[in-house]
Amino acid sequence: MSTQANTPDYDLLIKNVRVVRPHGNVVFDADIAITGQRVAKVAPGIDATRARTVYDGRGRLAFPGVVDAHMHSGIYSPLEEDAVSESKAAAMGGVTSSLNYFRTGQYYLNKGGPYRKFFPEVLKLSKGRFHVDYGFHLAPMDKTHIDEIPMLIEKFGVASFKIFMFYGSHGLHGTSNTQRDFLMIGEDERYDVAHFEFVMRGVQAAREAMPDKARQISLSLHCETAEIMTAYTKLVEKDKSPNRLKGLAAYSASRPQHSEGLAVFTAAYLAHETALPNINLLHPSSKKAVQAALMMAEVFPHIDFKREVTIGHLMLDISSKAAELAKVNPPIRPREDVEYMWEALLAGELDWVVSDHACCRQEMKIPKHYFGNIWMAKSGFGGTEYLLPAL
């Protein structure tokens, strides 16, 4: 690194890097000039005397800042703490935009109520704490939230909404008989397929009322079928044979791949029924899930189905030594599913790669006396810091 004495045109010049362009399939040699924390010029052979500081990139790859479109902050630590630590992790991995899924209910701020009161608190706790650009997707959990969709778009700029399809009988970590308490919704509320339909109708009504924003307004779905998961969890837990499945293999079997595929079918038909064309199918983890999504794209060509994949589902399989530390929803899958996900990604059948970052410290993830027990582990792990390096 060197410093120039004369009046500079640029604050920083990074010389001799191989630049990666979005949507490109080749890299090219260039220099990058920066002024006022913004890229001012990308070109070969920029004169070093025009910069206050010159840094030799020595042939390293230079990427644009990464958008991690699927993160979670504030689940296992207070939001005001996670905003700092997890955005630092994002920046360390080259992520410069963090889009976080948020909801009312247990975890997060651990309270229910309307978003008109809840979301300003989220923004207040976040302000000045993130080290990268950030935004939020929100999940309408009850009728009031559906009614608030236009307000959330117009007043707060929220354009993406979410449905957790498996919350019908499952909580964050496994089966649950107290869903209303977990979700913190009223006695007359149900978080079920009918609610999913009404969320879609609410999102589409907002799109129609705001045609200038319609392209940006979308709905994301975590596609797993609660009833299938409940039944298969009982089957797996009931098996006491010497050869019974354990660890990540058991958890994968308890939330089988066809549970994802069936949920994709349901989500797709509801999107068709409600005329909602902007659908994001979040983190399919298996061949069956992706194939179901591709089939639905053919059946309903008027719907723009986006398909994402997490870096965890590309890097890990059920044989991972991480064991219960890799518990996540949807589960880590067998190797054949992982290989298929890579094939689908390289074939352009998956639209973006995300982390689904939900940092959970090891002592919280699974206490020592539960080591080896996948059912007692909490779900989720970090990942935004290795999103780009792993690829």
Please give the residue ranges for each predicted region.
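Histidine/acidic residue-rich metal-binding segments in metalloenzymes
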Residues: 147-353, 358-361, 369
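Divalent metal-coordination and catalytic microenvironments
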Residues: 17, 32, 37, 59, ...
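Short beta-alpha connecting loops at secondary-structure transitions
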Residues: 326, 371-378
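Short catalytic-loop micro-motif centered on adjacent basic/acidic residues
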Residues: 100, 135-138, 278-283
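Short, acidic/polar
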Residues: 79-87, 143-152, 266
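Histidine-rich, glycine-flanked metal-binding segment
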Residues: 2-63
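Metal-associated gating/positioning segment near the N- to mid-region
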Residues: 49, 57-129
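Active-site mouth loops of central-metabolism enzymes
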Residues: 69-81, 109, 132-145, 252-258
